[in-house]
Design a protein with these regions (language model features):
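N-terminal leader/linker segments that precede catalytic domains of diphosphate-processing enzymes
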Residues: 1-99, 104-122, 126-158, 194-237
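Acidic/polar loop patches that form or flank catalytic/metal-binding clefts of enzymes
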Residues: 161-163
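NUDIX/MutT-family hydrolases
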Residues: 165-203, 207, 214-216
């Protein structure tokens, strides 16, 4: 196992939060504003590109994830919610972690968007007709040797508890308000040492209710938190 992999990230001390950074203006988090942002992107640099870039154990595989922004105009928290999943504990890679729907690219996929849409349908039952892709974020290379393209999309309102989950891969699904995730005061920095080098990761612990109907803490960290932070940087640029 790579020394960069953490078996218990919750035990890594919190070095601080990024409360000094401003939250994204709610006016920039509407479906219309996001469509315009991706149609006319600014010049910007992602904050996180992934520690997998530094590991040469094997050739990295292409993958994509869907960043599903569910339209919830009836709620008073900005309207858009991010759909996330908790992976099952028996999986070889990223077991038990919070993730976006997604996975490895297949030869017949037309591109990252096709991969993300296919995987989202397989993992949580999202139909392509429910999803409108609005843009891509820069790739992120995981320590499990996947070069992941985040595909950002708007999703029609649906009942999370009624999603058709692939029970082999997905333990449960849940939503987090996009406005909450785009508030850096909720972004915690953890520091640790690996191979004599000080490294860091972000976490965004969310108290919520999953599709199983139980309230719990969802520990969003690692690649998922890094891609969300890159989305924040994209919207702040």
């Amino acid at each position: 196992m790579s020394p960069l992999r953490l078996l218990n990230p919750q035990s890594v001390p919190v070095d601080g939060t990024d409360s000094h950074l401003p939250a994204i203006d709610p006016a920039a988090l509407t479906a219309t504003a996001l469509r315009q942002r991706f149609a006319h992107p600014p010049l910007w640099t992602p904050e996180f590109e992934g520690d997998g870039r530094f590991i040469a154990e094997r050739t990295a595989a292409q993958a994509a994830v869907l960043v599903p922004l569910v339209q919830r105009e009836d709620r008073g928290d900005g309207g858009l919610h991010v759909l996330l999943t908790r992976r099952t504990e028996h999986l070889r890679d990223h077991a038990g972690q919070i993730s976006f729907p997604g996975g490895r690219s297949e030869p017949h996929d037309a591109g990252p968007a096709a991969t993300a849409l296919r995987e989202a349908h397989e993992e949580v039952g999202l139909a392509t007709a429910q999803v409108q892709v609005i843009g891509l974020l820069p790739t992120y290379t995981t320590i499990t040797h996947f070069v992941v393209t985040p595909v950002v999309a708007l999703v029609e309102p649906m009942d999370v508890s009624a999603l058709s989950l692939d029970r082999f891969e997905v333990a449960e699904a849940f939503e987090v308000p996009l406005s909450w995730l785009m508030t850096p005061a909720h972004h915690r920095r953890h520091l640790f040492e690996a191979e004599g080098v000080r490294r860091q990761f972000l976490s965004m612990p969310w108290q919520g209710v999953g599709s199983a109907g139980q309230a719990r803490e969802f520990f969003i960290w690692g690649a998922t938190a890094a891609m969300l932070r890159n989305l924040y940087r994209f919207l702040r640029a």
